[in-house]
UniProtKB/Swiss-Prot annotation:
Catalyzes the reversible cyclization of carbamoyl aspartate to dihydroorotate. It comes from Shigella boydii serotype 4 (strain Sb227). It catalyses: (S)-dihydroorotate + H2O = N-carbamoyl-L-aspartate + H(+). The keyword Hydrolase applies. Its cofactor is Zn(2+). Zn(2+) 1 binds at H17, H19, K103, D251. This is Dihydroorotase. Substrate binds at H19, L20, R21, N45, H140, L223, H255, A267.
């Protein structure tokens, strides 16, 4: 990586956690990812969810159809785990190169997760098969019991689900997605080479005060929810340390404005247009730009056993204003940091 003060040249990054949606929304958001990233792990929580090889093949084609000419982008598809999923279907998809990984959503933990897993025991045959074939498990790490406070769901998940699971299936590769707490940062750092994590730009840049003090900011509302400053700092320190089992996963999750600015608003930040520059800003603030390229472009492929991208992109350090909104067919989409001035952006 070469890093004169105003330009950062890095190997083309990948996004290891992305929501592209479907239909018109997919067509609108796709270019913001495909112009920057070489690959992305695409979340399967459509309605209905992606639970079969055929559904994944069809969705992959819709994604490719939405990629503009001139963009070189590969979607990496995932299977949505359910209590009734057939392990043979999962293995077939993995062997045919359709499924890169499988996603565990605890039932009702986040958007379109009502079909999710009710207990680890319910899917143990599937998880045992994944361990056997070397297929990574991607985990939304929150418990959903009504008596557990929303700010404590991730820490409880580590203790009650993640650690028992990893003790039981010691060879299973696990990505603890969008970690948000010091508990998770410590857990991943202290884990073995079969455990990795992704972190979003919003959880590195903000804490719950930013979302709640002086008025509710619905466009910072995502799940897992922003936590206390102590947790934000732990995440920043983890990425700044150069730790090699944490990597870029934006969790970019678009919702139309009326679904965010609502009496019961949806969870998710549409950060695809601004994520890479946001990460660069954090690494610069932490005096850790020497680790930026690995976080964006190397650590993820290394964990997944994939080659790194062979093309490069440049970020330029000059102030730019983020658009207030992006047009949809019948509404608008508000990007992460809308209307704000950002320090780093991708050189066009």
């Amino acid at each position: 990586m070469t890093a004169p003060s105003q330009v950062l040249k890095i190997r083309r990054p990948d996004d290891w956690h992305l929501h592209l949606r479907d239909g018109d929304m997919l067509k609108t958001v796709m270019p913001y990812t495909s112009e920057i990233y070489g690959r992305a792990i695409v979340m399967p929580n459509l309605a209905p969810p992606v639970t079969t090889v055929e559904a994944a093949v069809a969705y992959r084609q819709r994604i490719l159809d939405a990629v503009p000419a001139g963009h070189n982008f590969t979607p990496l598809m995932t299977c949505y785990l359910t209590d009734s999923l057939d392990p043979n279907e999962l293995e077939r998809g993995f062997n045919e190169g359709v499924f890169t990984a499988a996603k565990l959503y605890p039932a009702n933990a986040t958007t379109n997760s009502s079909h999710g897993v009710t207990s680890i025991d319910a899917i143990m045959p599937v998880l045992e098969r994944m361990e056997k074939i070397g297929m990574p498990l991607l985990v939304h790490g929150e418990v959903t019991h009504a008596d557990i406070d929303i700010f404590d769901r991730e820490a409880h998940f580590i203790e009650s689900v993640m650690e028992p699971l990893r003790q039981r299936l010691t060879a299973l590769k696990v990505v603890f997605e969008h970690i948000t707490t010091k508990d998770a940062a410590d857990y991943v750092r202290d884990g073995n080479e079969r455990l990795a994590a992704t972190i979003t730009p919003q959880h590195l840049m903000f804490n719950r005060n930013h979302m709640l003090v002086g008025g509710v900011r619905p466009h910072l509302y995502c799940l897992p929810i922003l936590k206390r400053n102590i947790h934000q700092q732990a995440l920043r320190e983890l990425v700044a340390s150069g730790f090699n089992r944490v990597f870029l996963g934006t969790d970019s999750a678009p919702h139309a404005r009326h679904r965010k600015e609502s009496s019961c608003g949806c969870a998710g930040c549409f950060n695809a247009p601004t994520a890479l520059g946001s990460y660069a800003t954090v690494f610069e603030e932490m005096n850790a730009l020497q680790h930026f390229e690995a976080f964006c472009s190397v650590n993820g492929p290394q964990f997944y056993g994939l080659p790194v991208n062979d093309t490069f992109i440049e970020l330029v350090r000059e102030e730019q204003q983020v658009a207030e909104s992006i047009a949809l067919t019948d509404d608008t989409l508000v990007p992460f940091l809308a209307g704000e001035t950002v320090r780093w952006s991708v050189k066009q």
